[in-house]
Amino acid sequence: MNNDQSEQCVRTFLDSFYTGDVARMEQCCDDAFVSLTYAPVEIFPHFGLKQGKAWIAQAIQIQQERYSDRRHSIDFVVADDTQAAALVQATMTKRSDSRVVTLNTGEFFSLRDGRIVEHRSLFDSFDLVQQLLGDDLTNEFAARLKNAMRQ
């Protein structure tokens, strides 16, 4: 059975991120907050392991600098007293060229006393790179990978 308080905390966290409300997002988080986004940090240096609430303001600022419009829909949330998970679809418009990118993410949370202690996020970074570049790299990448697997 879903824990309504935990679910609301997760929804507030996600809504606050995409609306840029740092203070509201921080209220959802424990002082020991940690976030880990599984993505290549060489390409996305603002992802990876981040510790502390200071990351929240930085992440929102980076997103707002890069994207003129950020929208999201929460497709699914399941939560109990100590854990929660959500599926989110984000649609963002790049400032540099007005290209619209769509990102599907899996968001996972650990909670303590009704606040988020740990946040983990997964998404298809290869797909995002292709969208950001506006170029389908699948065939080129597949050919290179096929050759590498033969060696």
PLM regions: where:
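A solvent-exposed, acidic/Ser-Thr-rich amphipathic alpha-helical stretch
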Residues: 24, 30-82
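Short, mixed-charge, low-aromatic patches
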Residues: 11-20, 43-47, 63-66, 87, ...
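Proteins with a high burden of low-complexity, intrinsically disordered sequence enriched in S/T/G/P/A and R
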Residues: 14-17, 25, 41-42, 52-56, ...
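A beta-strand edge to alpha-helix "cap/lid" segment located at domain peripheries
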Residues: 2-5, 64-151
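Hydrophobic pocket/interface hotspot
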Residues: 10-13, 24-25, 29, 33, ...
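Hydrophobic alpha-helical core bundles mediating ligand binding, dimerization, or RNAP-core interactions
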Residues: 10, 14-17, 29, 37, ...
